[in-house]
Amino acid sequence: MSVTYDDSVGVEVSSDSFWEVGNYKRTVKRIDDGHRLCSDLMNCLHERARIEKAYAQQLTEWARRWRQLVEKGPQYGTVEKAWMAFMSEAERVSELHLEVKASLMNDDFEKIKNWQKEAFHKQMMGGFKETKEAEDGFRKAQKPWAKKLKEVEAAKKAHHAACKEEKLAISREANSKADPSLNPEQLKKLQDKIEKCKQDVLKTKEKYEKSLKELDQGTPQYMENMEQVFEQCQQFEEKRLRFFREVLLEVQKHLDLSNVAGYKAIYHDLEQSIRAADAVEDLRWFRANHGPGMAMNWPQFEEWSADLNRTLSRREKKKATDGVTLTGINQTGDQSLPSKPSSTLNVPSNPAQSAQSQSSYNPFEDEDDTGSTVSEKDDTKAKNVSSYEKTQSYPTDWSDDESNNPFSSTDANGDSNPFDDDATSGTEVRVRALYDYEGQEHDELSFKAGDELTKMEDEDEQGWCKGRLDNGQVGLYPANYVEAIQ
């Protein structure tokens, strides 16, 4: 494809050779491309840093959530510790990925930004100084040769036109000989025309050859000047290429966690924690604490004593150890004792029978004293288990299906979370957010630094508070993300 040189030399370019007029522009464009490539590399690293940060946050949230679930779940002993080791691994790996993010942005990103600023200098009229210098250098080196090339093209065009005219004159003269109507005078004019065309052909040929010779004589100097400017552009590009290689190697070191001593230690510790799990030890512990190894106050003969105001029958003692936990006690007066969740958990051998006995019989009721009654409050919705229903059944096979997963997000984070402790209401306090927080679960609040909300409950043992936004949304948020409004 032919293009026209924009320096008004009127030369048509028939190839993409560097030596053709105007084809140096690809070399000039490479300078502008270098600046754009610096920006592209910075954007590339910035996106990777965002990914590293998001992954670190997800690991932290995952570890927090599952640490809470495992702590309150039915798993026990050394296997529980091995399971919990994965949460510690996630937290430590999260820290490493945050370090990767910091290295990418603070070291690599800033290094590219500073180099770009030092290597490329913007002009008031737009563009870069380096681009204009290269453009002017090539234009100056090519201008004399392009001028001679223009003369050659003009001489060639004139010579070819003369040759064409000569051929036409000869053709007319040959045709006129066969025409008897032409007089000798007309025939002589045609012959004179042929002679004149031959002279024009000779003159244009000499001029064409002369201009071409002059062009050939100026070509070595043209090539030398163009080569000099091109080498300057090559040196500039070499600096950029070497810099990119250096930066990419540093990025590789920052991303390669296998070379971090702490990374190997994380998985060494994880493996040791898993290998420390001992099924025999866990079974022995469960036998001693929840099985036949437990101590028992076997029934013995007791002498009757008039000083005893209250006695418990064997049946009552059995019920007391069957795991019935009272959540409310109504006394004879208007006074009532607050409910207190049990700190221990006893699994009844027959839950249905125990529940029936609990509702129909009070083990602390004095058989002789009709003035005092002890009963459960029917309207109390407090749970008698502090964390997890130990008697619930689990599916035989583990499944990713949320409907069969006892630790699914619906159960673990929704309103029916079996691990949630009873909420205890407190005095509402207005607080202000210190940092931005984006809720990771549907029961968590999202807010920006400076937003105000209402704290409804004090911080729990996991570091979370219950609060309400001004739009009425109620949920959980990290306690250390806010401060009380003075």
Curated annotation (Swiss-Prot):
Which parts form a coiled-coil structure per UniProt? 25-274
Read off the Gene3D superfamilies from this record: Arfaptin homology (AH) domain/BAR domain, SH3 Domains
Q: Which residues carry this modification: N6-acetyllysine?
A: 53
- Gene Ontology cellular-component terms listed: adherens junction; caveola; centriolar satellite; cilium; cytoplasm; cytosol; early endosome; endosome
Q: Which domain of life is it from?
A: Eukaryota
Q: What stretches pass through the bilayer?
A: none
Q: Which residues form the F-BAR domain?
A: 11-282
Q: Where is the SH3 domain?
A: 426-486
Which compartments is it annotated to reside in? Cytoplasm; Cytoplasm, Cytoskeleton; Cytoplasmic vesicle membrane; Cell projection, Ruffle membrane
Where are the residues of the annotated region (Microbial infection) Interaction with HCV NS5A? Answer: 1-362
SMART domains from the entry? FCH, SH3
Membrane topology listed for this record: Peripheral membrane protein
Q: What is its main location?
A: cytoplasm
Record flagged with keyword Membrane: yes
Domain comment from the record reads as follows: The F-BAR domain forms a coiled coil and mediates membrane-binding and membrane tubulation. Autoinhibition of these functions is mediated by an interaction between the SH3 and F-BAR domains. The F-Bar domain also mediates the binding to the cell actin cytoskeleton through the interaction with CAV-1. (Microbial infection) The SH3 domain is required for the cell-to-cell spreading of HIV-1 virions.
Protein's UniProt name: Protein kinase C and casein kinase substrate in neurons protein 2
The species this protein was found in: Homo sapiens (Human)
Lineage summary: Eukaryota, Metazoa, Chordata, Craniata, Vertebrata
